[in-house]
Amino acid sequence: VRPRPWPLLSKTETKNGERHVWTTFSEDQVDLNWKSPDVLFEFLDILLNYVSKGTRIVRLDAVAFLWKEEGTSCIHLRQVHEVVKLMRDVLVTVAPHVIVLTETNVPHVENISYFGRGDEAHMVYQFALPPLVLHGLLKGDSRSMQKWAGSLGDLPKGCTYLNFTASHDGIGVRPLEGLVAPEELRWLVGQVEERGGLVNYRSMPDGSKKPYELNITYLDALSLPGDPKLGLRRFLCSQAVMLSLRGMPAVYFHSVVGGTNWDEGPKREDGENRDINRQRWDWNDLEAKLDDADSDHAWVNNVYSSMLRTRANCTAFHPDAPQEVLT
């Protein structure tokens, strides 16, 4: 289940000499020992400091991997849920307006477990949405997406989804497990690679590797060779689907401005595959593109902005509003 292909332990120099430390994600991101009361209380202090500065949403990044126990998968352990509950309890006591958001890029059933019984996260990322919408629009077949959307039951009171299609990370494909056939996932990977995308893998227990995320701008992922305008419309259709679903939308900046693959990013000295969707814009250059009425950037930005205004002014899109999927 570990989301990376490189070694789990990283050699580190400490005041006591060389040590090997646990690094679930990368050597520059060392895991901490949450069994230590000092670690737990330090993070509660950090949490409260953020709240004192006006934080309204607290994002618990990759929280599923927080706790380690020998002989287990070290993911989704009971203690992880207890820590999330503790943070929720603290916030209910001192800052009940603050929202707890969990980020767990895992299959759907595992993902929504972080709602608990309405006593853990207020919101969870809707990780199945980005790959399902992409698959449906590229395939011209919405059945998998319709079946999944129709299966979304009622949530605990005060809970909702954070809907998105793109972010600073890649498009996670683990959430497709159980929703589309393995051969459909392989087809989707091929489609993304044909459009200039890059694939990140994870290591399996048998030493093999499986796709973990697709790195590409969502606009380029839906591009249509030979008919770029239709590709843009297909991209905007994907955003309309995301904006229409029950929950709260999370809109990625590069999507709003019609960003395309930043091929230079991964090739930089400090680059990684995800940088293809993290272009570092020059403000004057971007402003010129958005001011040019004939540019794709301006057209996408204008249509997208119009959709956002429409959504904001319609009470039917309140996170607590009921929703029915018609097929």
Tell me what each language-model feature is.
Residues 1-327:
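Active-site and adjacent substrate-binding regions of carbohydrate-active enzymes
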